[in-house]
Amino acid sequence: MIFEELDYQETPMGELTLRRRTFNGADVFEVKLGDEYLMSSLFVVAEEELAHLGLAAHGDPKRVLVGGLGLGYTAVAALADARVESMTVVDALPAVIGWHERELLPVSTALVKDERTRLIHDDFFALMRRDPSETYDALLVDIDHSTEHSLDASHASFYTVEGLTLMAAHLNPDGVFALWSDDPPLPAFEAMLAQVFATTKSHVVSFDNFLTGGVSTNTVYVARL
């Protein structure tokens, strides 16, 4: 299919491309990192459910941290929750933040014009290893393909009991951690979550796959202290 390249950047993780094409008469926005497709605006149901399910698990999620900005659908879904008073979004790639600051994407304006939004250029995984300077009611994370398929080898230690314990220190009491994954629920990771959090649940989110004509699924893990 013919596409328009909206941005191209060399990054430490590879060539990052934002492009737009038409599918069934509508604009579709896609992100590629090297040869891998990271995300498409055709498939955002599970990204939005990451916010909905994560915030629903908390009684009063005033302060939210989103790990991974991407096309912005998780962040904007979080802002739709009136209980959220502030939302910090962390992304390791300044180009991605720039796309939204330039309002290149469908949800960019709603995201950057909301006074509750703060966009931060930082490595989310490195941030979780540091002593917390701020704590949050909910952490919503969508960066890697899954717990076993990371975009960078440096992310792997996050998906361990030690990594999850360090992350949990950034949560307030009764705080919630929610994670998107492209894979089915993984019992080994569910067991790790259960060692760190008081309650855990794995949600399988189904959505129509307009390319295959079938139904696809993602997983949203939700865990609460």
What do the PLM-derived regions correspond to, one by one?
Residues D174-S181:
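Conserved beta-strand signature within the Rossmann-like core of class I S-adenosyl-L-methionine
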Residues V44-P173, V196-S206, G214:
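The AdoMet/dcAdoMet-binding core of the Class I SAM-like
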Residues M1-F29:
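N-terminal auxiliary segments of SAM/dcSAM-dependent transferases
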